[in-house]
């Protein structure tokens, strides 16, 4: 195997969107074209029992939302494609943000009837901060939506990114006739037996259709006043190519995939803590853990650490260094995924995502290296939780299951765990309420451990250096606790309590995460 050639073939990207914009449906269609599934499951068809292939966890199937990041791989047109399907629900932004550290590009799915929504904007900011290319898919043209020119304007005004349309819709909703493909200079037809037609046939096909007349006017306007196409600007994350289509009816998706693979970047390097960038073509293997997922197969109570390979080649059975612990590990049992199905990996290269079976060795953010290399990659973002719950086992006889469940789910990063310094009580912190619901559901369903949870409300969280800590600093306005790394932390009742503490202990430095 020529490793250089293999790395060049890799295209690793995440799909981001606001909930219900059609992200899971487009993922299904891409897998369909990659030959990974015989039929694309649709998220809406819940009563039929046909669930989306990429939504594999029980609670995701019930609620029609993605709450974990799935990793899926397929080959298409000479490229090896790695898709990371991210949680669309805002409470799961932590998992999503970490996933965005493991990709080289993003596909942003927008509901053409709703335009840019809150969660899309949040996720776009992270992508923009990383400077990776963004490809936009304006979805749901099979329904009535906003004017295409207005949607482009929103991209520029709300997200601050220039856009270039690769195709243009001819009507929408019941009047949807197809797409005017600007890149391939052809018509893509929504109705009838023929899939494509030449531009010259447009007048003959659509006659005096007012929508087609509007398309010609719009394109003339874009040619005169629109942005210029620039591959350089796309790769720099300054220009987003825009595709229109309908994921539900699988229209425009294959054209999008083919053009996307032409312009999406090959694997990037990754920055070490000293600022130096590790090149993907370095012969030495390196990678980092961006996600840990327990119970992908509930029958085996397993745990998988997802690793983005940054450089070199993975070979089954290889030994790696874990610089955080100073110890080594052997990578014998390694898999790649198609949602819940998996297959053993013999080798993989930079740009690939592999799943390493984990018995408690790894943490999110860990670096893996080989030989004399003991460097660490830049830390992944961590987040300060905003709401808290006390948690305990409902049945004292189930303490063992309770502790195992908490340990595994906390290591995934789905919730954060704190322990009251004085009482030893467990407290959970999360970015949003849904995280607690998922935690409770999974504790009961996967660990057979019912839990009692009582709200503590919002808290303002600050870490304190162990050497600065005096237990007498604890008061009725704060709770002194330890995080899961045994670092001391204060949970303040509100900002006033925090200011009161800062005034009382002016020499004590408190730290806030992201």
UniProtKB/Swiss-Prot annotation:
Q: Name one GO biological process term.
A: regulation of translational termination
Gene3D superfamilies xref list:
P-loop containing nucleotide triphosphate hydrolases, Peptide chain release factor 3, domain III, Translation factors
InterPro entries reported for this sequence: EF-G-like_DII, EFG_III/V, G_TR_CS, P-loop_NTPase, PrfC, RF3_C, RF3_dom_3_sf, RF3_GTP-bd
Matching PROSITE patterns, A to Z?
G_TR_1 (PS00301), G_TR_2 (PS51722)
Limits of the tr-type G domain: 8-268
Which key words tag this protein in UniProt? Answer: Cytoplasm, GTP-binding, Nucleotide-binding, Protein biosynthesis
Question: Main site of residence?
Answer: cytoplasm
Give binding positions for GTP: 17-24, 85-89, 139-142
Q: Does the keyword Nucleus apply?
A: no
A GO CC term?
Answer: cytosol
For this protein, what is any one GO molecular function term?
A: GTPase activity
Whether Cytoplasm counts among this entry's keywords is: yes
Q: Where in the cell is it found?
A: Cytoplasm
Instruction: Summarize the protein's role.
Output: Increases the formation of ribosomal termination complexes and stimulates activities of RF-1 and RF-2. It binds guanine nucleotides and has strong preference for UGA stop codons. It may interact directly with the ribosome. The stimulation of RF-1 and RF-2 is significantly reduced by GTP and GDP, but not by GMP.
Belongs to which family? Belongs to the TRAFAC class translation factor GTPase superfamily. Classic translation factor GTPase family. PrfC subfamily.
Q: Which PANTHER family match?
A: PEPTIDE CHAIN RELEASE FACTOR RF3
Name recorded for this polypeptide: Peptide chain release factor 3
